[in-house]
A protein has these predicted regions:
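C-terminal lobe and adjacent flexible extensions of AdoMet/dcAdoMet transferase-like proteins
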Residues: 188-247
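Conserved class I S-adenosyl-L-methionine
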Residues: 115-145
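A short glycine-rich, Lys/Arg-flanked "PGG" loop and its adjoining helix->strand segment in the class I
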Residues: 100-115
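Class I SAM-dependent methyltransferase SAM/SAH-binding core
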Residues: 17, 21-76
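A short acidic, Gly/Pro-enriched loop at the edge of an enzyme's catalytic core
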Residues: 75-87
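Short alpha-helix
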Residues: 133, 145-168
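Conserved catalytic loop of SAM-dependent methyltransferase domains
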Residues: 164-190, 199-200
């Protein structure tokens, strides 16, 4: 798998720093990471309850101890309308058959003024060029299932949903190599790329805020059952309720 390889570990380390910066000042009660349990995107966030959505059958095997794992699919999120403060999509849209539906679901569950943070591979980069060439010769560098989306396209989709773009970053300027020692030799490209050609980083991160009209309670919300997430199955409700009682 990509994220177990030296290039994958390099991506995870780089994105960890990006997510730490993006979520550190985001407050609320519920935060949701969709997939990629190898990455703790909410490490520096202080929300009351951190949830991770994983495919059916993987909620135990891939569980990250920092999260409460929930089984489901991103196209049909098992949460009530306007119930989540923060949603993280690490490399989700580019591997989805219907990324528009995922964004619609994220929009449905986010509270007004809630935030979505998205990461993805940048097609306008050396890694993107390597992937394009690999498809022509039958030797992919990144997973062939990915339909890598440009940052501009994702920005357009978010604007159509009336989201306000908050911040964005590019990262990972090393050459698309496979061996760890060869990638380590390219470390000098990080500072050069960040200064001279930042938009050609191999990965990007974008943060946006939901600007739909709506109201939100001010102050501490009582810890009553699970009205914010009533669509969970019984076992999941009991598990999350236990966590809520300990907050």
């Amino acid at each position: 798998m990509l994220f177990r390889s030296p290039p994958g570990q390099y991506i995870l380390q780089s994105e960890q720093a990006l997510f730490n910066q993006a979520v550190t000042d985001v407050f609320g009660y519920y935060a949701l990471q969709i997939g990629l349990p190898q990455l703790n995107t909410l490490q520096e966030n202080r929300v009351s309850l951190k949830l991770m959505l994983l495919p059916h059958g993987r909620a135990t095997a891939d569980q990250n101890s920092a999260y409460q794992s929930i089984e489901g699919i991103p196209e049909e999120l098992p949460f009530a309308d306007q119930s989540i403060d923060l949603v993280i999509l690490p490399h989700v849209l580019e591997f989805a058959q219907d990324p528009h539906q995922i964004l619609r679901e994220v929009d449905r569950v986010l509270i007004p003024e809630g935030r979505v943070v998205i990461s993805g591979f940048n097609p306008a980069s050396l890694w993107g060029a390597r992937q394009y060439a690999g498809r022509l010769i039958g030797k992919n560098y990144l997973p062939r299932e990915g339909q890598f989306l440009s940052l501009l396209r994702i920005k357009d989709w978010l604007k159509l949903l009336d989201y306000s773009l908050d911040r964005g970053h590019f990262a990972c300027y090393r050459l698309p190599l496979r061996k760890e020692k060869n990638m380590a030799r390219m470390a000098f490209l990080e500072k050069m790329g960040n200064r001279w050609w930042p938009i050609f980083g191999s990965v990007f991160l974008i943060s946006a805020i939901k600007r739909h009209p709506g109201t939100r309670l001010v102050g501490r919300v009582p810890k009553q059952s699970l009205q914010a997430i009533p669509q969970l199955n019984t076992a999941a409700q009991q598990s999350v309720q236990k966590v809520l009682e300990e907050v």
